[in-house]
UniProtKB/Swiss-Prot annotation:
InterPro entries: Kunitz_BPTI (IPR002223), Kunitz_BPTI_sf (IPR036880), Prtase_inh_Kunz-CS (IPR020901), TFPI/VKTCI-like (IPR050098). Keywords: Disulfide bond, Protease inhibitor, Secreted, Serine protease inhibitor, Signal. The keyword Disulfide bond applies. Serine protease inhibitor. GO terms for cellular component: extracellular space. The keyword Secreted applies. Expressed by the venom gland. It comes from Cryptophis nigrescens (Eastern small-eyed snake). Residues 1-24 form the signal peptide. One of its GO terms (molecular function) is serine-type endopeptidase inhibitor activity. This is Kunitz-type serine protease inhibitor nigrescinin-6. The lineage of its organism: Eukaryota, Metazoa, Chordata, Craniata, Vertebrata. PANTHER family: KUNITZ-TYPE PROTEASE INHIBITOR-RELATED, SERINE PEPTIDASE INHIBITOR, KUNITZ TYPE, 3.
Amino acid sequence: MSSGGLLLLLGLLTLWEVLTPVSSTDRPDFCELPEDSGSCKGNFEAFYYNSDQHQCLEFIYGGCDGNANNFKTIEECKLTCAA
């Protein structure tokens, strides 16, 4: 196979990896943690994975503490936790 063909194959495999949803067996354990706004009084838009609804949802993060099920963007949440 030519080097151009190998690069195309590598590019397609990389794209497939990025676009393929995370399966529940690959999902990190922290995706099962509940929404936790933390103990501070900030008002920051954040996203968490709701394991009952199997989707990423918005919540208000206080800015400190909380847990690892806390993402700045819905895209980051989906790439990490959504199946």
